[in-house]
Amino acid sequence: MPVVTRLMSFLGDRWQEEQRDAALFHEFDCPGPVQAGRVSRCSCPCPAQILDRVATDRRIVRDCEQRIRREQDRGLCWSVESVRAFQVMKAFALPYELHPGWQESWRP
């Protein structure tokens, strides 16, 4: 399923960018150090929230991808559950629709 693979790759790249950029929200008066653009165990709420959200999004989309792959391996091609899982994946991609790598076929 190349469309699922392309969408997963697109989402992974966007989330990697968000993880990297989370350090930009590090507060100046926080005693925790920022090293090489990464937030390392500080008490700033914003970077932690960004990183937690990205981790949760990754977990949900990974579960959706596994469901699609599992059903495909069993010979079920785009069952109702797979279609629903793919719609969830496309919904996670929607906030990035202005990115040059966005594909219109990903619109939920």
Language-model regions, residue ranges each:
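Aromatic-glycine hotspot motif
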Residues: 1-35, 54, 58
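Flexible loop/turn and low-complexity linker elements, especially glycine-anchored beta turns
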Residues: 2-10, 41-62, 85-108
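Amphipathic alpha-helical oligomerization segments
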Residues: 17-24, 45-80
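Functionally engaged cysteine thiol sites
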Residues: 26, 30-33, 42-44, 79, ...
